Structures are given as C-alpha cells and as structure tokens.
Regions:
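Conserved, mostly hydrophobic/aromatic
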Residues: 1, 45, 61, 69, ...
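Surface-exposed amphipathic alpha-helices with a cationic face
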Residues: 33, 37, 62, 79-85, ...
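Short beta-strand/loop segments at the ligand-binding rim of alpha/beta enzyme cores
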Residues: 40-45, 81-93, 131-140, 183-193
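Glycine/Thr-rich beta-alpha phosphate-binding loop at enzyme active sites
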Residues: 48-74, 150-181
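Glycine-rich phosphate-binding active-site loops on the catalytic face of alpha/beta enzymes
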Residues: 71, 104-124, 160-170, 208-231
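Catalytic cores of alpha/beta
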Residues: 90, 97-109, 144-158, 186-215, ...
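C-terminal helical cap(s) of enzyme catalytic domains, especially alpha/beta-barrels
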Residues: 176-183, 206, 219-245
C-alpha cells in the first residue's frame, strides 16, 4: 500500500466540505496584489515559525512599514497565529499543489498562497490559480526560470515570486533574477527574493522593475529583526526607487 500523502492525511482529519465551511466563515482576505503594488517597492518579511515571539514580531513588522508577512511551511497553526495579530496580508509559503491546501490556507487566515509552477502540469497550475482567485485569495506563483514564468503568465497569475535556481551562487542568483524581471510584463506584480546582500539586492531589483521583495528569515535573524525590516521597508519607499516615476 502506498504511503498516505500529507494532504490525504489532513483531509482524513478535516474533510474538504468541513474545511470549506470554515474557510468561508473567515473574514474576506485582504487584496495581496494591491498591498504589494502601491507606488513603492514593498517588503514581505518572512517569520520563523519556531520563534516564541512570532506574534509580537508580526506586529513589529507591520508597524514598521512591512507590506505583508510570509509564513513558511511547517506548523499550520503558525499562519493562524500570525493572521490573528497582523493587520497586513499574510502569505502562506507552503507550496500548494492541491485544492485542499488553498482552502486550508484561507481557513487559517492567509490572504495569499504560494503555488509552485515547477511542481505542477499546466492544467493543475491553471486550476489552482483559478481556485485561489475564486475564494478571494491571491495566488503567488513561484517561478525559477523563464519557461515557468511563461507558464505562470498563461495560467493567469497576477503575482509572481521570482526565485533563483536551486543551488545557485549569489552571483548566479542575481543574474537569474535580473533575467526574470526583464521578462515580466508590466501588469504583473513582480516579487523578487532577496539574497544575502539584502539592501543591495533591494536596490538592484527595484531598478530592474521589482514591485516587492521577499526577505527570508536568514536576513532577519539579528538582534533586532524589526529594525532591519523597517529599514529596508523605508528604503523601498525612497522616491529614488518609486514605481510611479
């Protein structure tokens, strides 16, 4: 007998019909695309679910100008905890490869959900983007190469998360993201994943047309992550990097 998949295990505990009722009882999700594209380069800050102060950190990030919060895959309760304390949109970074996960993300209070283009055939990619939009969520389609960017756009993605190829060096990552940014049409919200350079990456990606940047936990593991996120959010709002020029 084949091992039970994580999604099958979850649906055995909470059937899809029950999950849908729970999801639709939640407040209407906030519009992620509007939050991320507002005339400046916005910042999405990732929160480590293992942190004991994760809800306090969510409040700090929001108060310091972060446009959205991202929660990695792992503890499903973390998304609900963060969503309860944050007044900005929340992105679930658990890669959604099944409709059940879209519904679960909404039931937990997420406003945006990650859909990995590389892990899905075209039909499934289109279906998941449409499912997210149909329940007022924002699908953030993860893209690591030009082929998947084209597929994401054909699937109707309004927001794309541009990430470098797995295993790329810092220099290779910057080159790959620059290439992807140059391929994105104006109508799509372009989110670029910041590398170790942080500030330098934000400036570089902004000049290449990024609407937002994702700050991973490795960039926010210092003594005062709130200050770090706030500084980068302020930098993204600088007139020199304005997206409305």
């Amino acid at each position: 007998m084949a091992p039970q998949s994580p999604v099958d295990a979850r649906s055995a505990g909470v059937p899809l019909d029950e999950l849908k009722k729970l999801a639709l009882s939640r407040p209407t999700p906030r519009c992620g695309s509007e939050a991320l594209r507002c005339g400046r380069v916005t910042v999405i800050a990732e929160i480590d679910p293992a942190r004991a102060d994760r809800t306090s950190l969510a409040e700090q990030y929001a108060s310091r100008g972060v446009a959205a919060l991202a929660v990695p895959a792992g503890d499903p309760a973390c998304v609900a905890d963060i969503a309860a304390f944050a007044d900005v949109p929340v992105l679930s970074l658990e890669p959604a490869t099944a409709s059940y996960q879209i519904w679960q993300a909404r039931a937990q209070g997420a406003d945006l959900v990650l859909v990995p283009a590389a892990a899905l055939p075209d039909v499934a990619l289109v279906a998941l983007v449409e499912r997210a939009e149909s329940i007022a969520m924002t699908a953030v389609v993860e893209v690591r190469d030009g082929r998947d960017l084209v597929r994401a756009l054909r699937a109707g993605a309004r927001v794309v998360l541009l990430r470098p190829p797995v295993g790329a060096t810092a220099a290779q990552a910057r080159t790959a993201l620059a290439d992807l940014l140059s391929m994105c049409p104006e109508g799509v919200v372009r989110v670029a994943e910041c590398g170790p350079a942080g500030q330098a990456d934000l400036i570089s990606f902004a000049r290449l047309g990024a609407d937002a940047v994702l700050l991973g936990t490795e960039l926010l593991d210092g003594a005062d992550p709130g200050a770090t996120a706030g500084r980068l959010a302020s930098m993204g709002a600088h007139p020199a990097l304005s997206r409305s020029r």
